[in-house]
UniProtKB/Swiss-Prot annotation:
SMART domains: CASc. Belongs to the peptidase C14A family. One of its GO terms (cellular component) is cytoplasm. It comes from the Eukaryota. GO terms for biological process: negative regulation of apoptotic process; negative regulation of apoptotic process involved in development; positive regulation of apoptotic process involved in development; proteolysis. The gene is csp-3. Keywords: Cytoplasm. Its main location: cytoplasm. This is Non-catalytic caspase homolog csp-3. Disruption phenotype: Hatching is impaired in 5-6 percent of mutant embryos and about 2 percent of adults have uncoordinated movement. In the anterior pharynx of L4 larvae, several cells including muscle and neuronal cells that normally survive during development are missing. Slight increase in the number of cell corpses during embryonic development. In a ced-5 n1812 or ced-6 n2095 mutant background, where cell corpse engulfment is defective, the number of cell corpses during embryonic development and in L1 larvae is further increased. InterPro entries: Caspase-like_dom_sf (IPR029030), Caspase-related_regulators (IPR052039), Pept_C14_caspase (IPR011600), Pept_C14_p10 (IPR002138), Pept_C14A (IPR015917). Coiled coil: none annotated. Non-catalytic caspase homolog which does not contain the region necessary for caspase activity. Acts as an inhibitor of caspase ced-3 zymogen autoactivation and delays ced-4-induced ced-3 processing. Has no effect on active ced-3. Probably by preventing ced-3 activation, protects cells, whose fate is to live, from apoptosis during embryonic and larval development.
Length: 139
């Protein structure tokens, strides 16, 4: 009856009436050695105190995060591989999306009665793209 139909819904509701303040963007006052932390885009004078925040989880709340017996967790294994393979030219949000895809498609935990999968998640309030740079690019 509902096969092939939309699998989810999004509701946009106002959660509060509180106004977010702002913070100074202090990158211009940071010594040159640490300038590599700046984004590729020019900075603004002020920013929301809630902006430029990223949180990543190995799984959704209430679900198990799996680990190989001899290696690290599935999420950390794939995050490491994705960063090593793609960090030079891919921004962080896309690296995390690729990590999520790999964990969901690649891994299964063999339980006695059923097979378990894992789905990482992250949320981002980035206002800019964040790229990793090699040491050669910094110095």
């Amino acid at each position: 009856m509902f096969f092939g139909k939309l699998g989810g819904f999004a509701f946009f509701l106002q959660r509060a009436v509180r106004c977010d303040g702002f913070i100074d963007n202090f990158f211009d006052r940071i010594p040159k050695f640490f300038q590599f932390m700046k984004s590729k885009f020019p900075s603004h004078q002020t920013s929301s105190s809630q902006a430029d925040l990223l949180v990543s989880f190995s799984t959704s709340p209430g679900f198990l995060s799996f680990k190989d017996e001899t290696k690290d967790t599935w999420y950390i294994q794939e995050l490491y591989r994705v960063i090593i393979e793609n960090a030079k030219d891919t921004h962080l949000a896309d690296l995390l999306t690729e990590t999520n895809r790999r964990v969901v498609e690649k891994y299964e935990a063999d339980k006695v009665v059923f097979v378990c999968k894992q789905a990482p998640e992250f949320w981002s309030r980035f206002t800019k793209q964040l790229f990793f740079m090699s040491r050669n690019d910094v110095f």
